[in-house]
Amino acid sequence: FTICRMPVAANDFALDWYSYNENEGDFAMEKFSIAHDEQTLIPFIQAAQAYNPDLKIWASPWCPPSWMKYSKHYASRSTMKMARELKESLKEGESTYMSKVVDNGLPEDQEYHEGRDAFIQEEPYFKAYALYFSKFIDAYKAKGIDIFMVMPQNEFNSAQIFPSCCWTAKGLSRFIGQYLGPTMREKGVKLYFGTMERANTALVDTILNDAASGQYVEGVGFQWAGKDALPGIHQNYPQLKFYQTEQECGDGKNDWAGASHSWDLMKHYLKNGVNVYEYWNTSLDEGGVSRWGWSQNSLVVVAPDGKSFTYTPEYFIMKHVSHYVMPGARRIETEGSYEDLLAFINPDRSVVVIAGNNADEARTVTFRINGATYSPTLKAHSVNTFQIK
């Protein structure tokens, strides 16, 4: 792997909820500290850097310091209310995906939902939050970890029961254009808009068509339902870079069905112009249960004793692409009736074809590349990589 995403403070898999400054009113960020990350996150990244010193890292917050939100709480949605609504929506025989329900302490009347700014829309808070990003960049740089790009908010439309923060596009436009954008440019750090989890191109239009915020945005990140906005945004803004920022999380079974879904997602994103495709999570314990009760898939499953691990089918799906498609490669358009494939040309001019077969029986397909013909037989329920040098 050549690029990865990290959280700015807590996310939904964090051992506990925290920010880098929970001292309310410290607008000068005098008590800013990444000490919490020195326990696990920083050593984890440094270990990855030991394997790949050229690993590129970008970051986004799930939540600002809680005192910067109107609710003064990390979460945006009450766990107990969500669990009650899920239970009421179930049909007979159905079960919820939440394996456990833990009260997150957010009063129901303090929820902030899509279409409302949960972040306090006042200049001192905007300035302090931009400074928070700046100090994060500096603190990680001091640890030998360069953050090359940031996105302002993970899933900015989603009111979650874990650390989260809803923003309107207008609120983010103001923050980017007047505060975060100038601060990151001064640091030499790129700024992308995202992460986009809605199929609503107007959200991106609001940011990019504003003269103040649009000048700072060099790309857009998409995940979940945001993938359906990608084709139109790619067509309207071809000058930008596009990232797939989070793999859809699965159900913790880590089976072929999950891998097949990942392959379908890869094809959609890569055929519609993304430059980067990323996974979530890299490694989890068996079952992959998040702190709030969702069993999720991972590339690696760690045994309960912590002494061994297993690569999952989705690890090999990722490897089919990432091991053979080099940075700087370009996707090649293909013709014909067989569409379960991706093709790339690497900087060294080698051609890589990744071909899938989700049928219950083997299938022979024929490729014609540069005048040569290849007719491999693809096993049932498989993904296959061919490299032509």
Whereabouts are the PLM-identified features?
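N-terminal catalytic cores of secreted or lumenal carbohydrate-active enzymes
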Residues: 1-147, 178
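Conserved, mostly hydrophobic/aromatic
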Residues: 57, 150, 220, 269, ...
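Active-site neighborhood of glycoside hydrolase catalytic domains
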Residues: 127-253
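Short, solvent-exposed loop/turn and secondary-structure capping segments
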Residues: 15-19, 68-72, 161-163, 232-236, ...
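Folded extracytoplasmic luminal domains of secretory or organellar precursors
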Residues: 53, 148-151, 359-361
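Aromatic/acidic polysaccharide-binding cleft in carbohydrate-active enzymes
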Residues: 241-316, 334
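Carbohydrate-binding surface patches
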Residues: 323, 334-370, 377, 381
